[in-house]
Amino acid sequence: GGETGGEGKGMWFGPRL
C-alpha cells in the first residue's frame, strides 16, 4: 500500500511505507 506498496497491495493504497 502507500506510494511504495509496502503492505502487500503493490498499489497506491494502505499506509505510506
Curated annotation (Swiss-Prot):
Question: Where are the Leucine amide residues found in this chain?
Answer: 17
Please describe the organ and tissue distribution of this protein's expression: Expressed in abdominal perisympathetic organs and abdominal ganglia.
Task: Report the subcellular localization.
Answer: Secreted
Mind telling me which InterPro entries this protein's record contains?
A: Pyrokinin_CS (IPR001484)
**PROSITE patterns recorded:** PYROKININ (PS00539)
Q: Name one GO biological process term.
A: neuropeptide signaling pathway
Keyword Secreted, does the record have it? yes
Provide this UniProt record's keywords sorted from A to Z: Amidation, Neuropeptide, Secreted
Listed GO CC annotations: extracellular region
Kindly list the GO molecular function terms attached to this UniProt entry.
Answer: neuropeptide hormone activity
Establish whether keyword Secreted is in the entry. yes
Its biological purpose is as follows: Myoactive.
Question: Which family is it part of?
Answer: Belongs to the pyrokinin family.
- Name assigned to this protein: Pyrokinin-5b
Question: Which species is this record about?
Answer: Pycnoscelus surinamensis
Taxonomic lineage per UniProt?
Eukaryota, Metazoa, Ecdysozoa, Arthropoda, Hexapoda
